[in-house]
Amino acid sequence: MQPIPVNWALGVVLLLVLAACSRSTPEQALRQQITQMQLGVEQREPSAVIAPLAEDFLGNGGMDRQGLERLLRAQLLLNQNIEVVLGPVQAHIDGENAQADFTVMLAGGNGRFFERGRIHQVSTHWRAQGDQWLLYRAQWGDGKQP
């Protein structure tokens, strides 16, 4: 077996470092925002979920930003343990706007095992503001496309 030339190996390492440092695409940034919100629920940090909501956020039944925050805080009080499992995210970016649809499984409880669980189909609408995405519309339903 022939040794790999040092210059070639350094070149490959340099390319990997540059790729890791490159700016993320809008879709990557959107997916990262969704993941951060997921982690915010699981880590019981409501601010991580509420921060990316636009001031004019509108959810199911006319729920506004404050309504969603109250719902989240109520669930955190009800469930000591919460798990959020995202299905594949189908994202579509159109300039400064984006739509992301996915299935999410939510489970919660206070003991060793989850006592409650539900699967939702979620459709979200986002707009770019600076270098971040703000969620301005969300619809969710039980197992059916919203």
Model-predicted regions and their roles:
Residues 1-19:
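Sec-dependent bacterial lipoprotein signal peptides
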Residues 20-52:
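Short, low-complexity N-terminal intrinsically disordered segments enriched in polar/charged residues
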Residues 23-30, 42, 61-65, 115-119:
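Solvent-exposed, acidic/flexible segments
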Residues 37, 45, 49-50, 57, ...:
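Hydrophobic pocket/interface hotspot
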Residues 50-87, 93:
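Short solvent-exposed beta->alpha transition segments
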Residues 56-58, 106-107, 142-143:
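Solvent-exposed loop/turn segments at secondary-structure junctions
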Residues 74-116:
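Surface-exposed, charged secondary-structure patches
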Residues 99, 116-146:
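Short beta-strand edge/turn micro-motifs at domain boundaries
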